[in-house]
Curated annotation (Swiss-Prot):
Subcellular location(s) per record: Virion; Host nucleus
An example Gene Ontology biological process: viral penetration into host nucleus
Name recorded for this polypeptide: Nucleoprotein
Spans traversing the lipid bilayer: none
Species in which this protein is naturally found: Influenza A virus (strain A/Goose/Guangxi/345/2005 H5N1 genotype G)
């Protein structure tokens, strides 16, 4: 990556730290997840959850959402100023599932936000521990990425639904900071920028006055984040053009959509981290594991290790397949929603099936669903191997971006070819004559045309046995190249 010197590792972003050495990073990430674990244990005590109920992923999600809502200052302020009927701005809650007489029952709980904030701070040595909150946001975002394909949202902003693999982090809240920006896909950033430009077109005052100045700063910052994700000079130059535009309008929207399409082959660098549900950290802390002393990393073996030894349950609807539910959560845990299925299957050690073939709905259960027939199952979150999470997008040879499959944003740093249908992608570029023609466009199209699907990305990188924690012995899987992607 260019400008490597100015980049902080994700762990530093995650923990808000300045430059630290590896040991310090591991310790501060460890401190962050043990704080989440302690908070979860305390909440289980408050709610008098049994061991089984505390391991239920739906309960974990409710508790995580409560603390995120308790710390959402902007929304809290908004709720205070715009009171809506039947919503107490000072309270937060959600469904908690309990086991009664051999059945699962739903109980809606309500807590003071102040109380939740107190418990969270107490679990985090009296600090606000924003990093831990961001971590939970990213876990929810990864779960959404695995569960939903944002086709409707893409069409709404004038993008192509086939670009769904660029949409990582599209449900992350704005307040997720640098760690959140690192995991957002190219499509997500493009969509945020297009929404902003459209508002500017419809609302004359959007860029004007004191507020408009702040808007402009936000616009340029988002442009810079997106620029930093691109790995070729031409794409970056085009981003400069979008950023410097006096009065962003349709020409900029066209340029951004062009750039998003180009990212299907000249892929952006998007960070991946394994963020696990709070109950997993809670279980580990409860069993006496000292995260801060041992250190922890979101991109190495640690999350795999943790999942090897954690038993997490999930509620299952009558016609859902428990194995498919497990796959969904496994993908969410490793931020692998857009990974090549061959790679995921190899690491997991069981076949990972395409999203469309899963007979399972989302993890959360709607409040109007009948609990009578709902059962629970153990989620199978273990893996056969582990691999390092990547932030590069798969272009190991820096000089020219290597090819990318239409539906892949690599998660694991594992050698593979990135098969893609060049014809399909290039078809998206013909017949689009609006927008500016520029040397940059010509250059980008030329690079895309010269990309070869058989090029190998992540040369020499492999997966590792779970006993190989120092990653000394890479096993490079060989995929037969015509396998499903």
């Amino acid at each position: 990556m260019a400008s490597q010197g100015t980049k902080r590792s994700y762990e530093q972003m995650e923990t808000g730290g300045e430059r630290q050495n590896a040991t310090e990073i591991r310790a501060s990430v460890g401190r962050m997840v043990s704080g989440i674990g302690r908070f979860y244990i305390q909440m289980c005590t408050e709610l008098k959850l049994s061991d089984h109920e505390g391991r239920l992923i739906q309960n974990s999600i409710t508790i995580e959402r409560m603390v995120l809502s308790a710390f959402d200052e902007r929304r809290n302020r908004y709720l205070e100023e715009h009171p809506s009927a039947g919503k107490d701005p000072k309270k937060t809650g959600g469904p908690i599932y309990r086991r009664r007489d051999g059945k699962w029952v739903r109980e809606l709980i309500l807590y003071d936000k102040e109380e939740i904030r107190r418990i969270w701070r107490q679990a985090n040595n009296g600090e606000d521990a924003t990093a831990g909150l961001t971590h939970l946001m990213i876990w929810h975002s990864n779960l959404n990425d695995a569960t939903y394909q944002r086709t409707r949202a893409l069409v709404r902003t004038g993008m192509d639904p086939r670009m769904c693999s660029l949409m990582q982090g599209s449900t992350l809240p704005r307040r997720s900071g640098a760690a959140g920006a690192a995991v957002k896909g190219v499509g997500t950033m493009v969509m945020e920028l297009i929404r902003m430009i459209k508002r500017g077109i419809n609302d004359r005052n959007f860029w004007r006055g004191e507020n408009g100045r702040r808007t402009r700063i936000a616009y340029e910052r988002m442009c810079n984040i997106l620029k930093g994700k691109f790995q070729t000079a031409a794409q970056r130059a085009m981003m400069d053009q979008v950023r410097e535009s006096r009065n962003p309008g349709n020409a900029e929207i066209e340029d951004l959509i062009f750039l998003a399409r180009s990212a299907l082959i000249l892929r952006g660098s998007v960070a991946h981290k394994s963020c696990l549900p709070a109950c997993v950290y809670g279980l580990a802390v409860a069993s006496g594991y000292d995260f801060e002393r041992e250190g922890y990393s979101l991109v190495g073996i640690d999350p795999f290790r943790l999942l090897q030894n954690s038993q997490v349950f999930s509620l299952i609807r009558p016609n859902e397949n428990p194995a498919h539910k497990s796959q969904l959560v496994w993908m969410a845990c490793h931020s692998a929603a857009f990974e090549d299925l061959r790679v995921s299957s190899f690491i997991r050690g069981t076949r990972v099936v395409p999203r469309g073939q899963l007979s399972t709905r989302g993890v959360q259960i709607a409040s109007n669903e009948n609990m009578e027939a709902i059962d629970s199952n153990t989620l199978e979150l273990r893996s056969r191997y582990w691999a390092i999470r990547t932030r590069s997008g798969g272009n190991t040879n820096q000089q020219r971006a290597s090819a990318g499959q239409i539906s892949v944003q690599p998660t694991f740093s594992v050698q593979r070819n990135l098969p893609f249908e060049r014809a399909t992608i290039m078809a998206a570029f013909t017949g689009n004559t609006e927008g500016r023609t520029s040397d940059m466009r010509t250059e980008i199209i030329r690079m895309m045309e010269s990309a070869r699907p058989e090029d190998v990305s992540f040369q020499g990188r492999g997966v590792f046995e779970l006993s190989d924690e120092k990653a000394t012995n890479p096993i490079v899987p060989s995929f037969d190249m015509n396998n499903e992607g």
